[in-house]
């Protein structure tokens, strides 16, 4: 799927080795987005972006995403104060996923349930175990 905001790659070579940002949005008009802490390398969250979210992220250098559950654009941290300053944006080899290297503001968290990372649980012997304390209570 192509959009008016980004060019379409004209060849496999352009897609994989070209110099234009030409994201391959899925049938729902989305690409997967991984947010990684720019300083520690910790994976903070996985989300989705539509063309508008990607455009705003590129223009403002602040992470914007698309909420599939709310069906709306969302500027990460607008209500929580956990804005994500984008230090670097990468695409994968076929441009259907983006990696945002970010520096979180506020309390440094990214997870809506109060943790620094959305990946706060580890599977140990078939049971999920919380490996970190929440930054704040999510009530």
From Swiss-Prot:
Q: Which SUPFAM superfamilies match?
A: HisI-like
List cofactor names only.
Mg(2+); Zn(2+)
Q: Where in the cell is it found?
A: Cytoplasm
Secretion signal: which residues? none
Binding of Mg(2+): at which residues?
A: 92, 94, 96
What EC number(s) has UniProt assigned to this enzyme?
A: 3.5.4.19
Q: Which reaction does it catalyse?
A: 1-(5-phospho-beta-D-ribosyl)-5'-AMP + H2O = 1-(5-phospho-beta-D-ribosyl)-5-[(5-phospho-beta-D-ribosylamino)methylideneamino]imidazole-4-carboxamide
Cofactor mode of binding and number, as noted: Binds 1 Mg(2+) ion per subunit. Binds 1 zinc ion per subunit.
* GO biological process, alphabetically ordered: L-histidine biosynthetic process
Pathway, according to UniProt?
Answer: Amino-acid biosynthesis; L-histidine biosynthesis; L-histidine from 5-phospho-alpha-D-ribose 1-diphosphate: step 3/9
Under the heading Pfam families, the entry gives: PRA-CH
* Keyword Hydrolase in record: yes
Its job: Catalyzes the hydrolysis of the adenine ring of phosphoribosyl-AMP.
- Which PANTHER family does this one have? HISTIDINE BIOSYNTHESIS BIFUNCTIONAL PROTEIN, HISTIDINE BIOSYNTHESIS BIFUNCTIONAL PROTEIN HIS7
Q: What is this protein called?
A: Phosphoribosyl-AMP cyclohydrolase
**Organism from which the protein derives:** Caulobacter vibrioides (strain NA1000 / CB15N) (Caulobacter crescentus)
């Amino acid at each position: 799927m192509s959009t008016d905001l980004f060019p379409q790659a004209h060849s496999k070579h352009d897609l994989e080795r070209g110099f234009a940002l030409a994201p391959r949005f899925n049938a729902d008009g989305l690409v997967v987005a991984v947010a990684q802490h720019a300083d520690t390398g910790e994976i903070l969250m996985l989300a989705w972006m539509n063309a508008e979210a990607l455009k705003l992220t590129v223009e403002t250098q602040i992470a914007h995403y698309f909420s599939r559950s709310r069906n709306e654009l969302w500027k990460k941290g607008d209500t929580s104060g956990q804005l994500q300053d984008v230090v670097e944006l990468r695409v994968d080899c076929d441009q259907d996923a983006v990696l945002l290297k970010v520096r979180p503001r506020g309390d440094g968290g990214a997870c809506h349930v109060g943790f620094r990372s959305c990946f706060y649980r580890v599977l140990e012997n078939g049971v999920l175990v919380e490996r970190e304390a929440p930054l704040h209570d999510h009530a």
